[in-house]
């Protein structure tokens, strides 16, 4: 699934296209919402609790629908304060981006039902692709500084029943910290540590050998996924997120 940095840069572009007053007034809360489904990294909750999508279900799912089904108090954006409405809009963007990635890229290319069969190498290839997409979208330092500043200055006056405010404040620190560390390849082995360990890639020498192979692995991964599939995913997911966010805030 897209890394936190990519979720925020995509959310920024969606905000520029939508020009919604609630988002413009509360950019920090909005960017926080765009990362918060991954708060389970902090809380250790089950993924489905915050993504409203079960990875073990292979029938069609709609995370945004489940969000409002389980949290009906959030359905009416006009009844919420601007920060909460902006937060939920960002949250919607994350759910859509993840859901489309799972269904359009991970499962058909890397998952159990794919030719790669969901093995450890497939999951490393998936992480390599995610990292590269994040790296490309975060090359503009001015854009990243803008997002980081909005996040850091947000009052986090957000009220959602399924996540406490103190947890959101702690998560905000983590989100800001993510943007403080550019996604350079030297950092990849730390971010993908458990996947490398599962493949038996451990120790300084083992990691060094693997990192030397990353450029070739990235090329192989992009060839397998296909440029068109990547482009269609990014444009299609953004279009769906934009539509659902507009419906929510209108």
Residue ranges with predicted function:
Residues 1-250:
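N-terminal leader/auxiliary helical segments
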């Amino acid at each position: 699934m897209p890394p936190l940095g990519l979720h925020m840069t995509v959310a920024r572009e969606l905000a520029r296209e939508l020009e919604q007053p609630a988002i413009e007034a509360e950019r920090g809360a909005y960017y926080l919402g765009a990362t918060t489904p991954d708060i389970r990294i902090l809380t250790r909750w089950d993924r489905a609790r915050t993504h409203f999508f079960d990875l073990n279900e292979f029938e069609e799912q709609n995370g945004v629908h489940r969000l409002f089904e389980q949290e009906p108090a959030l359905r009416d954006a006009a009844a919420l304060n601007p920060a909460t409405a902006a937060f939920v809009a960002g949250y919607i963007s994350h759910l859509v981006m993840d859901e489309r990635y799972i269904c359009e890229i991970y499962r058909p290319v890397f998952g159990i039902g794919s030719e790669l069969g969901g093995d450890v190498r497939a999951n490393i290839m998936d992480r390599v692709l995610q990292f590269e997409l994040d790296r490309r979208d975060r090359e503009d330092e001015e854009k990243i500084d803008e997002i980081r500043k909005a996040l850091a200055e947000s009052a986090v006056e957000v009220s959602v029943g399924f996540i406490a405010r103190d947890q959101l404040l702690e998560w905000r620190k983590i989100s800001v910290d993510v943007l403080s560390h550019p996604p350079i390849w030297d950092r990849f082995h730390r971010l993908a540590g458990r996947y490398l360990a599962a493949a038996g890639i451990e120790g300084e020498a083992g990691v060094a050998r693997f990192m030397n192979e990353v450029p070739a692995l990235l090329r192989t991964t992009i060839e397998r996924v296909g440029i068109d599939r990547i482009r269609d995913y990014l444009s299609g997911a953004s279009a769906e997120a934009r539509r659902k966010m507009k419906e929510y805030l209108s």
